Design a protein with these regions (language model features):
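Hydrophobic residues in well-ordered beta-strands that form the structural core
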Residues: 120, 141, 193-195, 227, ...
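Conserved coil-to-alpha-helix start sites within the AMP-binding
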Residues: 123-129
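Catalytic PLP-binding core of fold-type I/II PLP enzymes
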Residues: 153-168, 174-213, 247-250
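Active-site region of PLP-dependent enzymes
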Residues: 200-214, 221-298
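Short beta-strand->loop structural element characteristic of the AMP-binding/adenylate-forming
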Residues: 138-148
Length: 298
């Protein structure tokens, strides 16, 4: 037998070594393009390291968020230079979590309520706009410029009303929109800015902050950024997405919406880290009601 007299660790390593060899032999054959060949604009980009990690995770058979999730969130946050990153199952879910975060009662008067307006564009992928419509907010569409297909920032003031609460737009095909103007507009009118960064992971933008020119990654200049890891994007998990922010309160709300609306912030498999799981009062619920099963965002 292939694993006879081997420990589980040794057997696992043997499998992973064979997976790496299989990938290099059958999946990564590189040939030159010939005249008339179809050259895709986007595709899966991977090598044996990704395939080994995929199989390693499968052998562990941990079927929900686990150590690879934790590692990825830390590395992506570090790469982007933000404090918080939350992995979700798709870029569409990332946009949904980002928008729904703005509806939280914890945001007070700045929360988005049904009937409030969100400035965006119609020329783009639908899931940038869909969360607002699904919730009952009103998208206010601004035209785009040609050939960039990004928002025409000169028309922002025309789209503003007393009901405007946020701007949620994408960087089209990796080309950043006019962040200087959009950011200044949002700050002037106390609006939330959500950057759909699904097309622009790794794109950098230079703008003035406190009298200095500062270069940051797109997706980190607004209040919340989102990414997608669907195969046509810069890197892939098959599916997958991420929501990131520097704001601790927004991060708390993002995590709550991601985890069924739960109020408790304890990670999976760990309970009562705060030491107050059973001694709180929640409205008319009995004193000591289990905080782990309190849901503050539904």
């Amino acid at each position: 037998m292939a694993f006879e007299h081997k420990t589980e660790t040794e057997a696992r390593q043997q499998i992973l070594d064979m997976v790496a060899e299989y990938c290099d032999t059958y999946h990564n054959k590189k040939g030159s393009f010939q005249e008339g060949d179809r050259i895709p604009y986007a595709s899966r980009v991977y090598d044996h390291k990704e395939m080994v990690n995929l199989v390693d995770s499968s052998l562990e058979f941990w079927l929900t968020s686990g150590r690879y999730t934790d590692e990825f969130e830390k590395k992506l946050a570090g790469y982007l230079g933000v404090r918080f990153c939350s992995l979700v199952n798709s870029g569409s879910s990332a946009n949904l979590a980002a928008f729904m975060t703005l509806t939280s009662p914890l945001l007070g008067e700045r929360r988005v309520k049904r009937g409030d307006e969100i400035i965006t564009v119609a020329c783009g992928f639908p899931t940038t706009v869909a969360p607002a419509i699904q919730y009952g907010a009103v998208p206010v569409f601004v035209d785009v410029t040609i050939p960039q297909y990004n928002i025409d920032a000169t028309k922002l003031e025309e789209a503003l009303s007393e009901k405007t609460k946020a701007v949620m737009i994408a960087h089209t095909l990796g080309n950043p929109f006019d962040l200087r103007t959009v950011k200044a507009f949002c700050e002037k009118h106390n609006l939330w800015l959500v950057e759909d960064n699904c097309d622009a992971l790794g794109t950098q933008y230079t703008m003035e902050e406190d009298g200095k020119e500062v270069t940051r990654f797109t997706g980190t200049i607004g209040d919340i950024g989102t990414s997608s890891f669907y195969p046509p994007h810069h890197m892939t998990m098959g599916e997958g997405g991420a929501v990131y922010t520097d704001n601790p309160l927004l991060n708390k709300i993002i995590r709550s919406f991601r985890d069924w609306g739960r109020d408790c912030v304890c990670p999976s498999g760990r309970d009562n880290m705060c030491g107050h799981r059973f001694d709180r009062q929640f409205g008319e619920l009995p004193l000591g009601y289990d905080h782990k099963y309190v849901y503050s965002h539904l």
